[in-house]
Amino acid sequence: MLRDVNDEVLARGLRVAHDLFDGAVQRGKLTAEQAAAGKARLTSTTAWTGFGDCDLIVEAIVENVAVKQRLFAELLTVARSDALLATNTSALPLEEIAALLPDASRVVGLHFFNPVSRMPLVELVLGRATARAAAESALQFVKSLRKTPVICRSAPGFLVTRVLFFYLNEACRLWEEGVATEVLDAAMQAWAGRLADALDRRSRGGCDRLHLR
């Protein structure tokens, strides 16, 4: 089940999902029947109807603490008391996101890396209040997707993004020293491929998230 702010955004999201299924068929990863069954399971809504039946709800909205806090407060009104609540944040501490909740024991971080359909790594982030049962449920979910979980504590940037901070900051220092953006990104692309377009990556990721606290 996919929820978003309006039908236009939902339609775009469903198109992307359908394209991923079609691509998997073309690459021989799925049969046409499996892809059709997967598409049939996808539903979309702008309301909270049906979320009371969910075992797991994953938030993947804008990287803004206040907005995420409001969403998690809404989730408490619709989710089952035993449902696992996850955030896909790549850098924000769970304690801040769950600050308005009376009980954060079932809140975890599930940071999927882009493109999600192909990247195997998932950061499983555990907050100070995360219960052992919630952590185990999240771990089993990640494994069921045949992805590689890495368990890390809740801290700014977690594990991968925290290492990435320093790489991106050095790229900005080179830019301040006069190295052109195009030159720097082209050189890093030639050296390390798609993950190395440092300045473009920092811009798309949001500079406000790349400051260690």
Specify the residue positions occupied by each region the protein language model found.
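Beta-strand segments within the central parallel beta-sheet cores of soluble alpha/beta enzyme folds
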Residues: 4-5, 35-41, 106-109, 184-189
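Rossmann-fold dinucleotide-binding core
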Residues: 87-162, 194
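NAD(P)+-binding Rossmann beta1-loop-alpha1 motif at the extreme N-terminus of oxidoreductases
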Residues: 1-20
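Generic beta-strand/beta-sheet core signal
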Residues: 3-6, 45, 54, 59-60, ...
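Long hydrophobic segments that form regular secondary structure
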Residues: 63-64, 68, 72-82, 131, ...
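Rossmann-like NAD(P)-binding element
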Residues: 8-12, 23-85, 91-96, 100
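Substrate-binding/catalytic subdomain of NAD(P)-dependent oxidoreductase enzymes
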Residues: 125, 129, 149-213
